[in-house]
């Protein structure tokens, strides 16, 4: 049964929920117990009190957390002069920026242009890895990802296009 609610994440309340668990189609199917078992939700959204940006964390198909900052289509970070291989440059976040484009968290009606990252890199432990008996690497808990999203939101808020910095 899906859960929905609020979680206190220090300065804000995060709206949380779970995806509908269709047998054979949920990241947790057959997954061994681990640190992720103490995080019974699949996504969370909040408005960052410091920047005013809508932020989100959500699990991918491997059960790893991904983090996103919704900066709005007009934000200068989306300008073509600020991209390298389609991703914003000069942002320091876990594993680097791996998402830049339209994103949605449909269960809570959050959507728009977002910058994001994932925690499924070499050295990261994904819950689905346990199905194949791989239990190495470091699992990045939701609390870690929330901290990275907050840092990313501040970097996006402070972002200035290169031409403004040089000219």
Task: Show the residue positions of the predicted features.
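Charge-rich, low-complexity N-terminal segments
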Residues: 2-56
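Polybasic, proline/glycine-rich intrinsically disordered low-complexity segments
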Residues: 44, 79-167
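Amphipathic, interaction-prone secondary-structure segments
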Residues: 34-87
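Generic signature of intrinsically disordered, low-complexity, basic-rich segments
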Residues: 11, 27-28, 40, 47-52, ...
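Generic low-complexity segments that are intrinsically disordered, proline-rich and/or Lys/Arg-biased
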Residues: 3-5, 24, 77, 89, ...
């Amino acid at each position: 049964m899906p859960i929905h609610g609020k979680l206190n994440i220090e300065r804000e309340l995060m709206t949380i929920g779970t995806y509908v668990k269709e047998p054979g189609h949920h990241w947790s199917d057959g997954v061994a117990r681990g640190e992720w078992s103490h995080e019974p939700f699949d996504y969370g959204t909040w408005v960052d009190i410091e920047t005013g940006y809508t932020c989100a964390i959500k699990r991918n198909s491997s059960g790893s957390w991904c983090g996103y900052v919704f900066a709005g289509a007009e934000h200068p970070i989306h300008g073509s002069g600020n991209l390298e291989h389609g991703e914003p440059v000069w942002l320091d976040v876990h594993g680097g920026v791996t998402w830049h484009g339209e994103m949605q968290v449909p269960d809570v009606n959050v959507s728009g242009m977002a910058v994001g990252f994932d925690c499924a890199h070499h050295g990261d432990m994904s819950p689905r890895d346990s199905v194949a008996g791989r239990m190495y690497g470091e699992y990045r808990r939701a609390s870690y990802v929330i901290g990275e999203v907050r840092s990313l939101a501040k970097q996006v808020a402070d972002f200035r296009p290169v031409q403004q910095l040089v000219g």
